[in-house]
Regions:
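Switch/connector loops and helix/strand junctions flanking conserved nucleotide-binding motifs
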Residues: 69-71, 119, 130-132
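Beta-rich strand-turn-strand
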Residues: 86-123, 127-129
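Intrinsically disordered, Lys/Arg-rich N-terminal extensions and targeting peptides
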Residues: 1-33, 141-154
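Helix-adjacent hinge/juxtasegments
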Residues: 53-95
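N-terminal first-folded block
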Residues: 16-47, 52-56, 65
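General beta-strand recognition
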Residues: 31, 58-60, 119
């Protein structure tokens, strides 16, 4: 069977763009079990409560829920276990230096297949306050309204 080419989106964390000011993004591989990959091929994963952390010089993705594979047997994986992020040492050090500042966290924004391998896009984010969220929504609505009016004039 030929190796799959290109990118295939598994799950997108749109909530992260709403809740955080995202700055620095990095692509990381994931150390997964076979049944986890099969469950991801079915498109089953939840990034809602997920975050990344650096522990003992290693990066971990915590809170990623990958449900058990339906055709798996008793060797099925634990759905909520922490998963190791595969990053270069300098990338881990750079992310850790940014996260040590107060208010910053590592947020997974996307989970996707790239050339047959599971990748996670991790971003450094600072939490938005309520008035920031309201302003973003108001700006988006105003932009939509302007586009509607421009289309109506044509």
């Amino acid at each position: 069977m030929a190796k799959p080419q290109g990118e295939k989106l598994i799950v997108d964390n749109r909530r992260a763009r709403h809740d955080y000011h995202l700055t620095d993004k990095v692509e990381a591989g994931l150390a997964l079990a076979g049944t986890e990959v099969k469950a991801l091929r079915d498109g089953k994963a939840t990034l809602q409560q997920a975050y990344a952390e650096v522990r003992d010089g290693e990066a971990w993705l915590v809170g990623l829920h990958i449900p058990e594979y339906g055709q798996g047997n008793r060797a099925n994986h634990d759905p909520d276990r922490p998963r190791k992020l595969l990053l270069h040492r300098r990338e881990i050090d750079r992310l850790y230096a940014q996260v040590r500042e107060k208010g910053f966290t590592l947020v997974p924004t996307r989970l996707y297949f790239k050339d047959g391998r599971v990748k996670a896009e991790i971003a450094v984010g600072r939490g938005k306050e309520l008035h920031d969220k309201r302003r973003a929504i108001a700006d988006r609505d105003a932009k939509r309204q302007m586009e509607r009016e421009l289309r109506a004039r044509r």
